[in-house]
């Protein structure tokens, strides 16, 4: 068993890390601008156009080389096909992924416009490559060849199978005219998806304000100052609210009058026919694309290479969860009904009143207050400055995986806003293994799409690139500028040199001022640990191949490391190792931690049931067939009536705000699926039966066991380091071990049922 010294607060001194996040940083010294993210081509917005041309030129050369490999007189050229396909993927994704970041976070519209253009051009180009028979035939020839004395490695075979699946999902075996349909439908889906996401990120349309008549009456219970601050059409007229605004949210949560809450809810969720049209057209385009590929539904297409494999398996998983959780969710609703009954003075019926969608937040707030001795709890935010949380994260990761964060000053021009911080991720040997840019703080005009993890560059081995055979003449890129290529760096325990991963985390955590740091609430803390789980997967999952590096794995596996991180932050023993008051340095009182954790669990069944409903909705939308009509609002309302515990609301269309319908099309169940697996791994590797007093207080032994290197190394070696380079079912089975591990490693229907039982437990 690997053991580290006993955890002490002194050992967890924050050093330079906390000030890096808790104090305003001085501007970098005047100097010629550095390229964005220290990537040489990214010197200015107008550098993206020549970079795009350079990328296409290089990609064309690689395509020609790969397609010619089967006829090449040297068998070694065929042996290089998997490597060259991975290089081709890296050449394109290195620019596409960077543009995805820039178009979402950069405040300069010139950068955004240039990134949008490059993104569209290269995504369309990639869609065409996915139907290239030359590439596909070369890959088939490669995997069919035995290569005596030098067979394809398991990693190469995994990468090859990933590419083959991508080609076949793109209809590579279809006639040329049908393949052209694939490209057209894919481009349409890309365009519609971007529009849908922009609508979802923008929130409800503000074209028609919400009107609250007689606000002095309907808004009783809210402060007179708040009511007086609301704009009106005319003096003594109705108050006007922007749908989805913070004022609307305040009324939905705190207004005692049900009619006021109803008006705000319907106004914020009202059906927008243009947005509904975009969503339904996108879903129909996906159904058409599935038909082109010879599949019944888009869910069949999307799940073919996922752990769940089929829509039937997903529906079985979700239906069993819904059946199990519905009574508990109904019990949560009954608790809210009782509170509503107490506040409904004119009630004459003995039946409990219905809790509507506009009641949920209001009575949930009252329910939470009813659990507290004096109706409230002291805030925990002073104990969690961003710097304190980052220091705790770094020390936790050091104990588990032997990696830590090193704060680094950025050069002028390296980041898109002065509030962005850079961390170098270091191994135990003092070697940098990657870079994380942290765009964590609020700023005017910052997109409010929530927290996100962007992979700007994946890791891969680069010293063995056979670039001399690409067929590009000397000086071919002289007029196009620099590319994304790197020389690579040596990593401890790995042969060769690797390009290091670069990731970006974005959140909206308030601002850092001279007067004090940004402080995190409980949800913020969970968000930070969750997103850092993705980043650490990228840092540790450094494989030889770009296409299976880090988070490039099955969608229903990728959330596992992040959800596991949430378990650590929910452990009082772990929190007690770093949570200190930002002014007094006093430790967070354990009873206060426990009270907040208990509060966080209130109405949890209702929240879980809501997630199940959303996952079922995602499946239903992506189970429509070619030519089938779709009324997305009717489908959502019927699902709420049949499976939900709160009735639907006429005239609303919440589904247009469900942005994950694009990015997670038919795979939104992944959050629940990975939550089941993460819970099992947590109890098997880290909690190890610690459910008694030692786990619930600051007993150092509890923290030492939870943060044991033994558990961390097991998860690192059996899961994280592989990225997507190994069958995820085998990884889960390996880390669980025993009879259950053997069963789940098979990845069949019984394995799916077993994961479902883990969730129900």
Swiss-Prot record:
Cofactor-binding details, from the entry: Binds 1 zinc ion.
GO molecular function terms noted in the UniProt entry: metal ion binding; metalloendopeptidase activity
InterPro entries attached to this UniProt entry: M3A_MIP, MetalloPept_cat_dom_sf, Neurolysin/TOP_dom2, Pept_M3A_M3B, Pept_M3A_M3B_dom
Metal-binding in keyword set: yes
Highest taxon above the source species: Eukaryota
Function field: Cleaves proteins, imported into the mitochondrion, to their mature size. While most mitochondrial precursor proteins are processed to the mature form in one step by mitochondrial processing peptidase (MPP), the sequential cleavage by MIP of an octapeptide after initial processing by MPP is a required step for a subgroup of nuclear-encoded precursor proteins destined for the matrix or the inner membrane.
Family from the record: Belongs to the peptidase M3 family.
UniProt-recorded name of the protein: Mitochondrial intermediate peptidase 1
Organism the protein comes from: Cryptococcus neoformans var. neoformans serotype D (strain JEC21 / ATCC MYA-565)
Gene name for this UniProt entry: OCT1
């Amino acid at each position: 068993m690997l053991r580290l010294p006993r955890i002490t607060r002194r050992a967890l001194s924050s050093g330079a890390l906390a000030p890096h996040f808790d104090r305003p940083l001085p501007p970098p010294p005047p100097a010629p601008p550095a390229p964005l993210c220290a990537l040489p081509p990214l010197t200015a917005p107008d550098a993206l156009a020549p970079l795009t041309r350079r990328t296409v030129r290089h990609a064309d050369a690689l395509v020609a080389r790969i397609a010619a490999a089967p006829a090449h007189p040297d068998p070694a050229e065929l042996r290089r096909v998997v490597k060259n396909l991975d290089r081709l993927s890296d050449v394109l994704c290195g620019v596409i992924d960077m543009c995805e970041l820039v178009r979402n976070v950069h405040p300069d519209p010139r950068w955004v416009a240039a990134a949008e253009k490059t993104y569209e051009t290269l995504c369309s180009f990639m869609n065409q490559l996915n139907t290239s028979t030359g590439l596909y035939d070369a890959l088939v020839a490669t995997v069919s060849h035995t290569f005596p004395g030098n067979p394809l490695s398991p990693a190469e075979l995994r990468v090859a199978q990933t590419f083959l699946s991508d080609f076949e999902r793109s209809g590579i075996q279809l006639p040329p005219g049908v393949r052209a349909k694939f490209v057209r439908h894919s481009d349409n889906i890309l365009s519609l998806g971007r529009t849908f996401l922009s609508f979802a990120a923008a929130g409800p349309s503000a074209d028609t304000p919400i009107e609250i008549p007689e606000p002095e009456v309907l808004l009783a219970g809210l402060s007179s100052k708040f009511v007086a601050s609301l704009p009106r059409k005319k003096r003594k007229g109705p108050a006007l609210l922007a749908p989805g605004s913070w004022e609307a949210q305040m009324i939905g949560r705190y207004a005692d009058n049900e009619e006021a809450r109803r008006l705000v809810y319907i106004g914020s969720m009202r059906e927008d026919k243009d947005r509904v049209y975009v969503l339904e057209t996108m879903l129909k385009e996906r159904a058409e694309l599935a038909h082109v590929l010879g599949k019944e539904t888009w869910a069949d297409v999307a799940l073919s290479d996922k752990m769940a494999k089929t829509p039937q398996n997903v529906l079985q998983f979700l239906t069993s969860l819904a059946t199990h959780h519905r009574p508990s969710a109904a019990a949560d609703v009954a608790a809210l009904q009782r509170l509503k009954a107490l506040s409904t003075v004119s009630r004459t019926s003995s039946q409990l009143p219905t809790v509507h969608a506009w009641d949920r937040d209001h009575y949930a707030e009252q329910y939470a207050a009813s659990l507290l001795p004096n109706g409230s709890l002291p805030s925990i935010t002073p104990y969690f400055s961003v710097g304190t949380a980052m220091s705790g994260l770094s020390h936790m990761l050091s104990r588990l995986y032997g990696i830590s964060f090193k704060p680094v000053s950025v050069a002028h021009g390296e980041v898109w806003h002065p509030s962005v911080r850079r961390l170098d991720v270091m191994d135990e040997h003092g070697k940098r293994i990657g870079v994380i840019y942290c765009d964590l703080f609020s700023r005017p005009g910052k997109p409010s799409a929530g927290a996100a993890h962007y992979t700007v560059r994946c890791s891969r081995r680069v010293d063995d690139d056979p670039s001399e055979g690409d067929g590009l003449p000397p000086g071919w890129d002289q007029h196009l500028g620099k590319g994304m290529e790197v020389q690579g760096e040596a990593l401890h325990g790995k042969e060769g040199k690797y390009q290091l991963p670069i990731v970006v985390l974005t959140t909206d955590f308030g601002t850092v001022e001279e007067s004090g740091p940004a402080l995190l609430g409980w949800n913020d803390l969970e968000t930070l640990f969750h997103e850092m789980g993705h980043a650490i997967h990228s840092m540790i999952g450094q494989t030889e191949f770009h296409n299976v590096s880090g988070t490039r794995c099955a969608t229903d596996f990728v959330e596992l490391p992040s959800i596991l991180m949430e378990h650590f932050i929910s452990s009082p023993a772990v929190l007690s190792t770093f949570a200190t008051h930002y002014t007094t340095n006093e430790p967070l009182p354990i009873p206060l931690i426990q009270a907040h954790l208990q509060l966080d669990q209130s109405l949890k069944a209702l929240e879980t049931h809501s997630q199940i409903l959303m996952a079922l909705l995602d499946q239903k939308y992506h189970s429509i067939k070619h030519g089938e009509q779709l009324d997305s609002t009717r489908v959502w309302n019927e699902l709420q009536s049949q499976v939900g515990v709160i009735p639907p609301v006429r005239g609303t269309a919440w589904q247009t705000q469900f942005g994950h319908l694009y990015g997670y099309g038919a795979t939104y169940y992944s959050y629940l699926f990975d939550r089941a697996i993460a819970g099992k791994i947590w109890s098997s590797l880290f909690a190890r039966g610690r459910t008694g007093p030692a786990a619930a207080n600051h007993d150092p032994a509890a923290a030492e066991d939870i943060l044991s290197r033994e558990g961390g190394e097991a998860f690192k070696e059996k899961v994280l380091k592989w990225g997507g380079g190994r069958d995820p079912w085998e990884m889960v089975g390996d880390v669980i071990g025993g009879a259950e591990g053997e069963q789940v490693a098979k990845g069949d229907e019984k394995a799916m049922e077993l994961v479902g039982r883990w969730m129900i437990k």
